[in-house]
């Protein structure tokens, strides 16, 4: 069982990775299988990440999910098939207990990190709660988000750095935030790929800089980061599973120094 005490160990590195959203069972299972193979070989604890729905899209016709229950059942199947814990986002208070029946970690999106009722609902499930730092917040302000969860009697908190707004269409990572948030006594996660988003594009779809993934990961390691989120989108035309296998090997190898 995934426990927050195990994740707090200074020498523990673990990886949260998977598709941005659950788009179909075959894709999710194949991605999980590839990453489990890689992380088992490198002896890295792994948590499968996949949103069962995406509620924070720019356009009303953007993809949001395949159906809540269908996607949650896929997350449960991945956990049972591969023996790995799972994490998914929640967006509303009623999502908390529903998702908690299927996954091990509830994740609070960055845009929602100050929503008290949502944080309280997540805390009351007794699950680990990963709160992503809002692009508009200082690292030190995240202590208040964490305290809302702790005050509910749940000390299973993780905090995630995912970049800070830098103008209208870009993000920048201030790596001072990693050691600053670690002083609160909770594991700090580095969301490598979302830190490279370029939001507010004229197309209504966020862009990104995937060629800088390794740079962001290496810099986080130097900042005493030991936990990473890596996710991919299937919007590209190439084989998602093949691409994910290659990208995961490169990413994991970068941060642990075991693969060229």
What residues fall within each predicted segment?
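Short beta-strand segments at enzyme active-site cores
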Residues: 15-16, 44-51, 85-90, 190, ...
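Active-site mouth loops of central-metabolism enzymes
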Residues: 17-30, 58-66, 84-89, 108-110, ...
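Glycine-rich, proline-tolerant flexible connector loops at the mouths of alpha/beta enzymes
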Residues: 16-27, 46-68, 232-243
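Catalytic alpha/beta core domains of metabolic enzymes, predominantly
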Residues: 8, 125-232, 236
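Catalytic beta/alpha-barrel core
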Residues: 66-67, 81-95, 104-117, 128-139, ...
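N-terminal amphipathic alpha-helix/helix-capping segment at the start of soluble metabolic enzymes
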Residues: 1-16, 73
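Alpha-helix-loop-beta-strand connector modules within alpha/beta enzyme cores
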Residues: 33-42, 61-87, 122-128, 178-188, ...
């Amino acid at each position: 069982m995934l426990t927050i005490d195990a994740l707090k160990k200074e020498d523990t590195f673990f990886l949260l990775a998977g598709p941005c959203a659950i788009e179909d069972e075959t894709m999710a299972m194949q991605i999980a299988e590839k990453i489990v193979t890689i992380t088992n070989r490198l002896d890295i604890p792994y948590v499968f990440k996949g949103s069962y729905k995406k509620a924070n899209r720019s356009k009303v016709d953007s993809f949001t999910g395949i159906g809540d229950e269908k996607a949650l059942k896929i997350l449960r199947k991945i956990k049972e098939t591969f023996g790995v814990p799972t994490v998914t986002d929640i967006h509303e208070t009623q999502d908390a207990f529903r998702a908690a029946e299927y996954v091990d970690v509830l994740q609070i999106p960055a845009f929602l990190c100050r929503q008290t009722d949502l944080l309280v609902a997540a805390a009351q499930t007794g699950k680990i709660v990963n709160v992503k730092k809002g692009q508009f917040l200082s690292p030190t302000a995240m202590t208040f988000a964490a305290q809302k969860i702790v005050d509910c009697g749940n000390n299973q908190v993780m905090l995630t750095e995912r970049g800070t707004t830098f103008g209208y269409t870009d993000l920048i990572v201030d790596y001072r935030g990693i050691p600053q948030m670690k002083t609160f006594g909770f594991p700090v996660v580095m969301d490598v790929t979302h830190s490279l988003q370029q939001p507010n594009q004229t197309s209504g779809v966020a862009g990104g800089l995937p060629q800088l993934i390794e740079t962001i990961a290496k810099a986080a390691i130097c900042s005493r980061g030991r936990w990473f989120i890596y996710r991919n989108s299937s919007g590209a035309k190439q084989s998602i599973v093949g691409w994910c296998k290659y990208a995961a090997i490169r990413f994991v190898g970068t941060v642990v120094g075991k693969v060229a």
